[in-house]
C-alpha cells in the first residue's frame, strides 16, 4: 500500500537504459543495508523513492533505519534523486502492540502483523526538517521530487490516509527550508502514477549522463 509500483516502474526505465539496479525494501534493515553498501562504494547513484523509515525514526515506529538514514549518498558525493514515499505512515506490528499514546490516532490494519499510523501535520513538519537538514549539506547532484497528489497508495484522495493538511505541512516545510543547491521538483501526480516514476528515473539518468 506504499510506493511499490513507483519503484517497479522506475526500475524498468533504468534497466532499459543499461543501468544495473539493486532494489531495497524500506523495512529498517533495508535502509541500513542500502546506506551501508553506498558507504562501502558499491553503489554510484541513488534513487531514494521510499523514505518512510524517517517517519519511523522520528515518530517512534518499528521500522526505523536509525538517525543516519539519508546521509550515505550525501557523504559519498554520489548523485541522488530523493522522494517522499510513504511518509504518510509509521509502522507497527499487530494492532494490540501499538503504544498506548497512539491508540486514538488514525490507524490502518494492513494485515494481522502490520498496523500503519497516519503521520500528523506536526510530525510531517519534523520529518521535512530532517530531510532538509540532511540534503542541504550535499555537494553532489541532488533532486528532491514531490508527488503533490499523494505520497503513498493510501494517501491519495478517497483513501484512508488522505490528509491534505498533513501533506501540505510536509511540502511547505520542505519549500521553506531546502537550499537552492538542491533541485526541488514538484509534480502534480501521486507517487505511483507512471508519469511520476518516469520523471524520477529520467532525472537520475540525466545526472548519470
Where in the sequence are the language-model features?
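Short acidic, glycine/serine/threonine-rich loops at helix termini
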Residues: 5-11, 33-37, 57-60, 92-96, ...
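A broad, low-specificity signal for short, low-complexity segments enriched in glycine/proline
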Residues: 6-7, 41-44, 102-108
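Short helix-loop-beta junction
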Residues: 10-20, 174-181
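A short alpha-helix capping/helix-coil boundary motif
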Residues: 12-15, 47-50, 111, 151-154
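A conserved active-site cap/scaffold subdomain adjacent to cofactor or substrate pockets
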Residues: 20-24, 29-82
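C-terminal non-catalytic interaction/assembly regions of soluble proteins
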Residues: 64-68, 72-79, 84-209
Amino acid at each position: 500500500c506504499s510506493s511499490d509500483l513507483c519503484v517497479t516502474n522506475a526500475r524498468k526505465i533504468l534497466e532499459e537504459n543499461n543501468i544495473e539496479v539493486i532494489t531495497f525494501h524500506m523495512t529498517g534493515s533495508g535502509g541500513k543495508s542500502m546506506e551501508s553498501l553506498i558507504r562501502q562504494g558499491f553503489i554510484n547513484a541513488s534513487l531514494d523513492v521510499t523514505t518512510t523509515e524517517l517517519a519511523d525514526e522520528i515518530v517512534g515506529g518499528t521500522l526505523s533505519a536509525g538517525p543516519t538514514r539519508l546521509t550515505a549518498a550525501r557523504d559519498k558525493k554520489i548523485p541522488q534523486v530523493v522522494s517522499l514515499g510513504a511518509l504518510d505512515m509509521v509502522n507497527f506490528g499487530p494492532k494490540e502492540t501499538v503504544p498506548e499514546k497512539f491508540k486514538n490516532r488514525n490507524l490502518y490494519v494492513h494485515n494481522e502483523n502490520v498496523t500503519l499510523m497516519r503521520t500528523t501535520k506536526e510530525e510531517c513538519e519534523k520529518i521535512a526538517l530532517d530531510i532538509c537538514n540532511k540534503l542541504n549539506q550535499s555537494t553532489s547532484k541532488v533532486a528532491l521530487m514531490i508527488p503533490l497528489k499523494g505520497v503513498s497508495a493510501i494517501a491519495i484522495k478517497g483513501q484512508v490516509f488522505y490528509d491534505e493538511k498533513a501533506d501540505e505541512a510536509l511540502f511547505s516545510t520542505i519549500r521553506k527550508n531546502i537550499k537552492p543547491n538542491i533541485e526541488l521538483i514538484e509534480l502534480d501526480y501521486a507517487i505511483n502514477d507512471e508519469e511520476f516514476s518516469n520523471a524520477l528515473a529520467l532525472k537520475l539518468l540525466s545526472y548519470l549522463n
